[in-house]
Curated annotation (Swiss-Prot):
This protein's name: Collagen alpha-1(XIX) chain
Triple-helical region 6 (COL6), as annotated region: 1048-1105
Family: Belongs to the fibril-associated collagens with interrupted helices (FACIT) family.
Intracellular or extracellular location(s): Secreted, Extracellular space, Extracellular matrix
InterPro entries named in the record: Collagen, Collagen_superfamily, ConA-like_dom_sf, TSPN-like_N
Main location: secreted
Amino acid sequence: MRHTGSWKLWTWVTTFLLPACTCLTVRDKPETTCPTLRTERYQDDRNKSELSGFDLGESFALRHAFCEGDKTCFKLGSVLLIRDTVKIFPKGLPEEYAIAVMFRVRRSTKKERWFLWKILNQQNMAQISVVIDGTKKVVEFMFRGAEGDLLNYVFKNRELRPLFDRQWHKLGIGVQSRVLSLYMDCNLIASRHTEEKNSVDFQGRTIIAARASDGKPVDIELHQLRIYCNANFLAEESCCNLSPTKCPEQDDFGSTTSSWGTSNTGKMSSYLPGKQELKDTCQCIPNKEEAGLPGTLRSIGHKGDKGEPGEHGLDGTPGLPGQKGEQGLEGIKGEIGEKGEPGAKGDSGLDGLNGQDGLKGDSGPQGPPGPKGDKGDMGPPGPPALTGSIGIQGPQGPPGKEGQRGRRGKTGPPGNPGPPGPPGPPGLQGLQQPFGGYFNKGTGEHGASGPKGEKGDTGLPGFPGSVGPKGHKGEPGEPLTKGEKGDRGEPGLLGPQGIKGEPGDPGPPGLLGSPGLKGQQGPAGSMGPRGPPGDVGLPGEHGIPGKQGVKGEKGDPGGRLGPPGLPGLKGDAGPPGISLPGKPGLDGNPGSPGPRGPKGERGLPGLHGSPGDTGPPGVGIPGRTGSQGPAGEPGIQGPRGLPGLPGTPGMPGNDGAPGKDGKPGLPGPPGDPIALPLLGDIGALLKNFCGNCQANVPGLKSIKGDDGSTGEPGKYDPAARKGDVGPRGPPGFPGREGPKGSKGERGYPGIHGEKGDEGLQGIPGLSGAPGPTGPPGLTGRTGHPGPTGAKGDKGSEGPPGKPGPPGPPGVPLNEGNGMSSLYKIQGGVNVPGYPGPPGPPGPKGDPGPVGEPGAMGLPGLEGFPGVKGDRGPAGPPGIAGISGKPGAPGPPGVPGEQGERGPIGDTGFPGPEGPSGKPGINGKDGLPGAQGIMGKPGDRGPKGERGDQGIPGDRGPQGERGKPGLTGMKGAIGPVGPAGSKGSTGPPGHQGPPGNPGIPGTPADAVSFEEIKHYINQEVLRIFEERMAVFLSQLKLPAAMLSAQAHGRPGPPGKDGLPGPPGDPGPQGYRGQKGERGEPGIGLPGSPGLPGSSAVGLPGSPGAPGPQGPPGPSGRCNPEDCLYPAPPPHQQAGGK
């Protein structure tokens, strides 16, 4: 018994105390920096009950939601997950720790780059970060070294690829003093030795689960995210909660093993005496009572009390890699994520596959015949064509021209058969053969031709004959004149299929056939050399908007906005402009009398007449003085009146309603060139520049505003004087689009652009007109027999031939001879049966009807090539043969007309990312887009250069007549003061009575406003086209500029921006031309006025500012005044 007790004590000590004492060396120190983690969720591993660390999901107060069965996930939301670091790690991080996360990616994020965890310092510079890159299938760990530089360690292993398969996975990173260890699904993937780390500033902020492009939460399903203060924890963690397939059923060993042994998942199995090897690295502990102490080996002990939890054991050696888990269940479709920010331009992708052939367009108009090309080289032999079905018999061609007399040929084959003999006995019935079968050569010798027999009954089909041997080429005949064209022979019988001939020369191009079936996708061709840039083409028409495409994957962050371009050089001064007549100036001081000169031109306006009677006072409350209206047109010049007496100065009346705008002035001299902004879309530039020139929609007519209230009368200020000319005001809001202007003259040609890339192969064009007959070609090889021709006309009666000797009895025709391959069987015609015995020659009878086809003759000798005949009409298309191998690409055909737009196809799967395309040709202005969302006001831009003098606007409607002002008090006549210095020009006095008619002046030159209008249009178009040509030549890569700003299609045009800052005052206009002579005034001559005083009246006081006018219509911004807010530069975390 004493030995038994000692053995029990030794067993207890070696089983429990020894591992417990050893484990004390690897425990963390939670009392220093790490709190104890909560334990209610860790029933799969008992030792986790005393783990210390940080649960980032709880620290960020993330909400829970069910994501698969009873598995819960954190809802990441749509706001950046960022907290103060000191709140997450109040006492900092230990030097060694472990990061453990369990998640699965979604379809939209399996190719995204995102931060799992990131600590920033107070300057928002990254100190520690863990990056998961779905595009490169890598995991990156970054920290700052002891010298402050960023150190980035990239783990790129084949074992990491399943991390992005949209299944649940555990990822762990063990951070030790000089070692980084990466675990996935409880397996060690790789370890890296690192340099010494720098201390971490915990006064900054911490970010989790954020996209690298815009910082928004990444679209993943996150189950847990913890940081353990024990760097060796990952080697002990189990993956039982990943999938049921990770947990094998418990065997008998599980019920007898101690809690310490099972909790370590077999990693410390060598410490257990007599313990068998575990079959799997994952042993899941059932949630039930724990096993007690083991009993003695030779006696069954009583159940012991529940043991105390054991300490952490020593780190076991890494186990063998587990088997690959089964594919997880399909995840529930997640919510649609928010639209991501534009990423940076990605690397050039591989060449995309060739697109499918488009639908056939309508036939284009036949182009003009091109010039005759040089004779091409002999093409390579084409692939052997399969025998197609017999085509439908074509129509008989027109008789050819009479050829030249040929040379004398060699002795021909035997002549036509003699006169008909008596009918022979019926032949034996031949075997039924399919149409076009093969014939074997007969065994009998060829007898002499007998006399022609009478027409026998139609015989049964004979046996097929075999292919005869190829005949030798005969010697060339003696040269003689060409014989006359013979009569058309009778159609021969269908022969057997001949031996495959050598490939013939390429035939003439056939008619355009119907489109073939869609071929298989060919392999992508290699990138050809870059062609020289082409001329700038005409803009293409705006296409119909396509269907909504599949949401693209997020790109890399974009780069910074490029610096604005330098302003263009100042243009040369233009020719002086032509202006409209100005108003007549006031009289100057009287000059000294000169000698009598010749008859002068029209005189200056006369002095103002005496003031009229005071009108009755107006009715109504005095209103504020309105703003100054535009000057009205000069009225008809009345006759000069007599000098009137000086009137009493009255109170200044209210300003009248605004008069109509004057007619458009001629263009002034050109100013500095407009610094056109580098817009990403030329269409938007043109729209802003000329108010949507393409649409040509007349502007809406402005609605006449309500009458303003009557202004208050201004107070009389005798000391007031006319103010100096104020600075040029800011440009008004642009008016609405005016009516369609007259067609301008053709502009100057633009600058020659670079040659464009080689276009796509065009659709084969229609056959061109037949060219002139070329020289006779070389002798061609013998072609295949042509289709059976139509029955010819009856030939003229030939001279009777000599009767041939009687032939020997024939052999039963069960097989044909070998030359039947040269002919085709007519429908319903059969091989003749036995020939009858030769009869005596009968008397010459009348020409009988055309007989059946005669017996097959021997092949004739090869004749000389005949003169090329005229091209016959095209026969009907034959039955389609089997598709041959694809031929070499033909020359591009004449472009056809644009076909009708086909139906919009279904959205296809996104193809692989292709390389950045070359810049396309600028298209035409697109159709006006839908009203965009009101953009945010942009920052105030720098002061622009001085703009050109604007073109005078159209004449506005005539304002209504203002209400009369109150009658002013009559002032007393003051004493005549001394003559002062010449004052500024005073306001015009009251209208005097009409004077006597003046002497008619000489007529002035007429001004044609249509010519002025035409000249304005011509000058505006010329300046616009010159500047557009310079702008387009400088803008060499519009597509590259667009792609640098954003990916994807450009959005609809935004609303008009806020008006820009006022420009500098424009240059003073030129003096107008002399106006036409006015019509004589109408009215009775007035009575002579009283002489006026020589003193000039005091100027009236300036009126008070008028009421605020109604807001004008929303205008379009001038391109040089438009402000385009630059996107803020994206802050990227650096990495090494």
